[in-house]
Amino acid sequence: TANPVIRNIIGQPKSTFNIRQIMDEGKILVVNLSKGLIGEDNAGILGSFLVTKIQLAAMSRSDIPDIKDRRPFYLYVDEFQNFATDSFATILSEARKYGLNLTVANQYISQMEETVRDAVFGNVGTVISFRVSADDSPILAKQFEPQFEPNDLLQMHNRNFIINMVINGEKAPAF
């Protein structure tokens, strides 16, 4: 690659950090995948690569027999659509049992492939929505029924949101 940042990252014979160790020891890993810094294609490739490495590290925690002994690890993904692959759909469906907790942010539902979208809505415990487009409101309104309708999502004021949560395994009313 012509980008020196990318070349320095992927051109190393050995990684300087261990994602499994970061998970197990409760450390923090922050990765800046700014498109302005490394370019859109490079950000997507590195992000997908990193997500796969995190998935593999999380799944390797199966060597800790008791789920309660798996230290929780939190993965936050902004601009989720850039990394939303079928592999990510697998992470969404299996993450909890490996102690991997996910928070993803996305601007438009249509930016996700259908399989990923189904995995997101089938596996999330909390959905937060600000004002959305006419295309997204019918899809998201299903998450907030019966308290809210599609039109409610279209007409929200700035800095207001609707939230739906699962509390102690039970779906709480949206508010």
Regions found by a protein language model. Give the residues of each.
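P-loop NTPase motor domains
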Residues: 1-100, 116, 153-157, 161-172
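Conserved ATP-driven motor cores of ASCE-family P-loop NTPases powering translocation/secretion/packaging/pilus
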Residues: 91-173
